[in-house]
Amino acid sequence: MSRSFHTEGIILKNYRFGEIHKGVVFLSPREGLVDAVAFGAYSPKGKLRTVTDPPCMGTLYLYRDPVKGLMKITDMDCRSCFPGIRESVRKFFHASVFLETVLRTFGGEGPFVYRLLGEALSLLEAMPEEKLTELLVQFLFRYLSSAGVAPNLELCGTCGKERSDREPRYYRPGGVELYCGECSHPEDGVIPSGGVSYIQYTHTLPLVEALQVRLEETSLQSLKGYLLSCIQSLSMGSLKSLRTAEGFL
């Protein structure tokens, strides 16, 4: 295997590596999650200083150092650093949830997740803030589907009863399964029938088309709460971005 290679990537996380070096975790469609080092990136004149910050996206040029056991970033051709996301507090926190969701729970399906994350970031940068919740809902459900843990929207998770068109679904906080009214508990959260029908209809549409489908606010907020609970469960409660983003999602 060649020691030098290149791959597409989206930067998910930075951390300090020594005094002036930057640890970089990025998502590659081929390699999955990659932990690499950008040497000198924290120095004032480091050429990789800004292009290796989240959520920059582009082509990374890498070198496998078998002696040190490191992956080095030698260069990056950055296609976008998404300035529109950085300029909006709400967009920034939505992007943080997208990135940390992938960082903490990625288990495969690299090409699909890479396309989903890249498209979500591109749409997030340009879209009006009043549409952010729809994008969050669509991203989270599609991500859960790619991980193989999306809920069955048609059948009750306990009795297997098929859902009627006007029937809501219920969920246990921290769980993924959805239940019919007869199998629900008093403390369960509820997703109105319109919210369930919305996801059934839109989750197979292209993302940009799904965002054109309107949903009333109560159902939208219910879906958001449910899907965020699912992601927290999948990550075993490790998503710090959900705590820091409280009030902005």
Listing of model-derived features with the role each one plays in the protein:
Residues 1-22, 27-249:
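Non-catalytic alpha-helical scaffolds and adjoining flexible linkers that form interface surfaces
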